[in-house]
Regions:
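Residue-level hotspots within the lipid-embedded alpha helices of multi-pass solute transporters
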Residues: 19-23, 56, 96, 100, ...
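Small-residue hotspots at the loop-to-helix junctions and early N-terminal turns
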Residues: 38-49, 126, 130, 189, ...
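Helix-terminus/linker motif at the lipid-water interface of multi-pass membrane proteins
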Residues: 24-42, 111-120, 176-183, 244-277, ...
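Small-residue-rich hydrophobic transmembrane alpha-helices
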Residues: 41-101, 140-159, 254, 265-331, ...
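Transmembrane helical elements of multi-pass membrane transporters/channels
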Residues: 10-29, 132, 143, 166, ...
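N-terminal transmembrane alpha-helices
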Residues: 3-31, 35-36, 52-64, 96-100, ...
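Short runs within selected transmembrane alpha-helices of multi-pass transporters and secretion channels
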Residues: 62, 132-151, 159-170, 188-203, ...
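Short alpha-helical transmembrane segments in multi-pass integral membrane proteins
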Residues: 1-15, 69-136, 180-237, 293-358, ...
Length: 443
């Protein structure tokens, strides 16, 4: 398998700008929602934290499909790529519809179980927003399935353009819903639903294009292919379990952060928004590893897989250094727009320094490299390591550093970095061991 520098650039740059766009639009959305009132902001924020679990599940499912599709593309078995794509779409629809129905039925019960202590106005905002956003689950899952197909073919510019159009629809819709129709929380929820439906329709239409290397065929969508579906789920389920437990630990740690006082909670919240921006390189490179390494393994070209593991790691590290230094340099400028005390701003800057340092030296090995290992079929090992590291290292050290050593949110950040470092060491050793070469995703 051969990927030229131009091929890699054409994959990486659109993915990076797509993720950056999503991040910036998220900030704009929060700004627009703030005009509805504090209850709306709180309600949307709480529901988004709940919806994140489902987003990760749909992403895990799509990633499983991407690994299988990439390997079949590498082996040049076009009919099997179409079978895998069709089964991914079929299961994504069924799975997301089931979740949508469950959330619509148990909407209020779930919210009161999770956020029962919030004020009534916030709870009503939560109920309204969740009911509307639940209808977008199938659209989100369908889009992820189609995006996985296009990314497996290294056609990332397509998903970038769809994302641009979708986010423009979302922003304009939010402005109309909030400032023209004065629809409150619903004025923010419906544009998101419309934007996701738009993305799902466009990507699905494009995926039926028979001139593509792999494409949707009705005969593969309207049938239950147990063997092919099993191959997809063998990758998706461990990844979904890993991401689910990771989210649960994050929720648990948010209750620990709540013990540290107002200024530390505020600093942690602002720092996390900057961390998300700094983490874009790792988020971008994950799908690139899946596509490239997946195709190499499908072609049974172990030498090329070794070569691109090393090349992509070099790109990730260099890109991470440049981006994280840039974010660190502009952090003081960003902090000028926050109405925070000097003490809080100083704490934010310390947290960003800690994060960006380890995001450069450890996360490339704990994040993108692990996606490469998953693309070879080495999913159970990465799942077990990630779960143990998340629970034991991040969870326990957060309590020790944050509470016992009285380091507060700095302790939480150090525990997070220790988690990354542990995974980085173990995954690097796993790569060096060559055990990942022994796995088989497709027959």
């Amino acid at each position: 398998m051969t990927f030229t520098n131009k091929d890699l650039k054409n994959m990486i740059i659109p993915l990076f700008f797509e993720q950056l766009l999503v991040m910036l639009v998220g900030i704009i959305d929060t700004f627009i929602v703030s005009f509805v009132g504090e209850s709306a902001v709180s309600g949307v924020s709480l529901v988004n934290s709940f919806n994140t679990v489902f987003i990760y599940l749909f992403t895990a499912l799509a990633s499983g499909g991407a690994v299988v599709i990439s390997q079949y593309i590498g082996r040049k078995e076009n009919e099997d790529t179409n079978r895998a794509s069709g089964q991914l779409l079929m299961f994504s629809i069924i799975f997301s519809l089931a979740l949508m129905i469950l959330v619509l039925i148990f909407n209020e019960s779930l919210l009161r179980l999770l956020f029962g202590r919030v004020e009534n106005s916030v709870m009503q905002a939560c109920i309204t927003y969740l009911k509307i956003s639940a209808y977008s689950y199938p659209a989100l899952a369908i889009y992820n399935a189609g995006a996985a197909l296009y990314r497996s073919m290294a056609k990332t510019s397509t998903t970038m353009y769809i994302s641009i159009a979708s986010n423009i629809i979302n922003c304009i819709g939010n402005c109309i819903g909030v400032f023209v129709l004065h629809a409150g929380v619903a004025g923010v929820a419906y544009p998101s639903l419309i934007a996701r439906v738009f993305s799902a329709i466009v990507i699905t239409f494009l995926c039926f294009n028979k001139t593509l290397t792999t494409y949707y065929e009705k005969k593969h969508i309207l049938v239950f292919d147990a063997k092919m579906l099993k191959r997809v789920l063998n990758i998706a389920v461990p990844n979904g379990i890993e991401q689910g437990i990771f989210q649960l630990v994050k929720v648990a740690l948010s209750s620990v952060v709540a013990l540290f006082g107002t200024y530390q909670i505020a600093a942690n919240g602002v720092a996390q928004s900057i961390w998300s921006l700094a983490a874009l390189v790792g988020v971008t490179m994950g799908p690139v590893f899946i596509t490239v390494i997946g195709q190499c393994m499908g072609a049974e070209d172990i030498d090329s897989a070794h070569y691109y593991f090393k090349k992509l790691m070099k790109i990730t590290i260099i890109f991470s250094v440049i981006w994280n230094v840039f974010i660190l340099l502009i952090t003081p400028l960003l902090l000028q727009y926050y109405q925070l005390s000097s003490e809080t701003k100083n704490l934010v800057f310390i947290l960003v320094i800690i994060h960006n340092l380890f995001n450069t030296i450890a996360f490339p090995f704990s994040g993108p490299l692990s996606n490469g290992l998953r693309a070879t079929g080495d999913v159970k090992y990465t799942m077990i390591v990630s779960i143990l590291s998340t629970v034991v290292v991040r969870g326990i050290l957060s309590i020790i550093f944050g509470i016992t050593f009285n380091l507060g949110v700095i302790g939480i950040a150090l525990a997070m970095c220790a988690d990354w470092s542990m995974r980085a060491i173990v995954f690097h050793l796993r790569y060096k061991s060559d055990k990942w070469t022994q796995f088989s995703v497709i027959e």
